[in-house]
Amino acid sequence: MPLVNGGKIADDSFVKLAVDTPLPEGGDILVPAERFLGEADALLKRGGKIGVIWPNNRDIAELVPYLGKIAVVALVFPSFRDGRAYSQARLLRERFSYRGELRATGQVLRDQFVFMLRAGFDAFEVKKAADAEAFAQTVKRYSVFYQPTGDGRLTALHRRMQLRHSEGAGL
């Protein structure tokens, strides 16, 4: 699957492992939540970065003690109608201050890309290369937003207030 990271098509250094797949000695891996929680100590001690595939029906609080040690949290969109991963993303960014890669996986669709960015996602697994190119272009399309969200960008109101303040400071 193509990966869009930071608004660009990127190589994915992570290998997805199933619950019963033998652990490689090194390299970056993505493991399912149940495997990570069951083998956290061993996984965190091995060479290479660790990422966790977190289902949207599992409490994100279970992952909080490990956030400083995890390079990637891949949140799953099992259906385009199921938006629980948006809530998980905002919690990770805003409440738990997670600064690692937040990846959207599963049913990642073009028309939801901007909303995913606003929720705090910075990487996206897409089904087709054409979608990856379209996603990369979407990053450039929107620069100002009205609602505050998990991506850390200033809202239109805050930008306007900063501009007025800087103009007033020069008098």
Labelled PLM ranges:
Residues 35-42, 80-92, 132-141:
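Active-site-adjacent beta->alpha loops and helix N-cap segments on the catalytic face
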Residues 11-58:
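A positional/architectural concept
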Residues 52, 61-65, 110-123:
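Catalytic cores of alpha/beta
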Residues 99-110:
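Glycine-rich beta-to-alpha transition loops that act as phosphate-gripper elements at the mouths
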